[in-house]
Amino acid sequence: MSLSEAEKRKILRERRQQKFSRGGASERLNKIVGGQGSQLDTKSALDEKPEVVEEIPREAVKPEMNSSVQAKKESTAQAKAEDPQVELFRQLAEMQGQGATESTPDLFSMMKNLGATGDSPFPMAEQQVEAIDPELVEYHKYRVNTLTAKTTLVKWIVLLAYIFLLTRTDDTYFPFVVRSYLPEVFTSQSSFFSIFLTFEILATSIYYQLSVGVERETGVKTLQDTSKIVSLVSMVPEGILPIADLRGKVILAMKYWNIIAMMIGDVCFVLVAIGLVSQI
C-alpha cells in the first residue's frame, strides 16, 4: 500500500519531533558551537597568565663575560706560547737585545730546520736540505779548514823556495849541484809565470780531490750544507726570479770564486815574498 506525499511528510515530522524530544539535536548543536560535551577547545589565549621571566642582574652577567673573555685570552696566549714560530722569533728578539755570542744558534740553520717541518712562514725552494747534526757540521768545517791551511802552507813554502831559486844566483841557499840537476825552465826567470800557473792548477786540483774525500767521510757538503749564502738562496721560492736552478748556479759560482780567491792570495804572497827576498 503506497503512502501519499502528505502522509510521508507527516511521518517524517513525527520522527523529528521524537528526536528533539530525546535531546539529540541539542547535543549536536552544543558540539558544533563548543558547548558542553563539545570536542572543540574553548580555552582562550587571553585567559593564560604570562610567564614571569626572572631578570638577571647586570652585575652577575658582567663577571661571567669577563671570565669568558679572560679564558679566551689565556687560551690564545697558551696557543701562541706553544707555536714554534712564535718561540723562534722570541728567541731571535732576545738574541738581538743581548748581542751575538759564540753560543748563539745559527739563524739560517734554525730557519732551514723550521722549513723542513712545514711550519715556517717563509716558503722554501724545491731543493730541501736535510737536517744534519750540528756537531758533524762543525767537525766537517774543522777538517776543511785544516786542509785549507795545510795546503796554503805547503804552497807558500814551495813558492818561497822557487822565488829564492830565481832571485839568488849564488850558492848560498841552493848549491850548484841542485841547480845543475834542475831543467833550465825552472831556473829561467822568464818562465816564472808559466811555472806558477801550472803549480796553482796542480795544487788546486789536489786540494779539491782531498776536500771531496773529506765530504765522503763526513757526509757533509762543504758549500751545500755549510754556506750561509747557499742557505739564504735556498729560501727563495722557485719561479720568483727568472733564473732556472738558482741554487745550483750559486754553488757553481762559489766554487769558481774559491779558486780565484786562492789564486789571488797566492799572487799577493808571491809579490810580498819577491819584495822581501830582494832586500836580503
Curated annotation (Swiss-Prot):
Region (Disordered) residue spans: 1-80
InterPro entries reported for this sequence: GET2 (IPR014802), Get2/sif1 (IPR028143)
Any one cellular-component term (Gene Ontology): endoplasmic reticulum membrane
Superkingdom of this protein's organism: Eukaryota
Protein name per the record: Golgi to ER traffic protein 2
Chain intervals with Basic and acidic residues compositional bias: 1-17, 44-62, 71-80
A Pfam short name: GET2
Sequence ranges on the Cytoplasmic membrane side: 1-146, 212-258
Localisation: Endoplasmic reticulum membrane; Golgi apparatus membrane
Subunit relationships: Component of the Golgi to ER traffic (GET) complex, which is composed of GET1, GET2 and GET3. Within the complex, GET1 and GET2 form a heterotetramer which is stabilized by phosphatidylinositol binding and which binds to the GET3 homodimer.
Transmembrane segments: 147-166, 192-211, 259-279
Membrane topology classification: Multi-pass membrane protein
Family the UniProt entry places it in: Belongs to the GET2 family.
Chain ranges on the Lumenal side, renumbered to this chain: 167-191, 280
Biological process terms in GO annotation: establishment of protein localization to endoplasmic reticulum membrane; mitophagy; retrograde vesicle-mediated transport, Golgi to endoplasmic reticulum; tail-anchored membrane protein insertion into ER membrane
Any one GO molecular function term: membrane insertase activity
Reported function: Required for the post-translational delivery of tail-anchored (TA) proteins to the endoplasmic reticulum. Together with GET1, acts as a membrane receptor for soluble GET3, which recognizes and selectively binds the transmembrane domain of TA proteins in the cytosol. The GET complex cooperates with the HDEL receptor ERD2 to mediate the ATP-dependent retrieval of resident ER proteins that contain a C-terminal H-D-E-L retention signal from the Golgi to the ER.
Protein keywords: Endoplasmic reticulum, ER-Golgi transport, Golgi apparatus, Membrane, Transmembrane, Transmembrane helix, Transport
Gene it is expressed from: GET2
PANTHER family, sorted: GOLGI TO ER TRAFFIC PROTEIN 2
Keyword Transmembrane set for record: yes
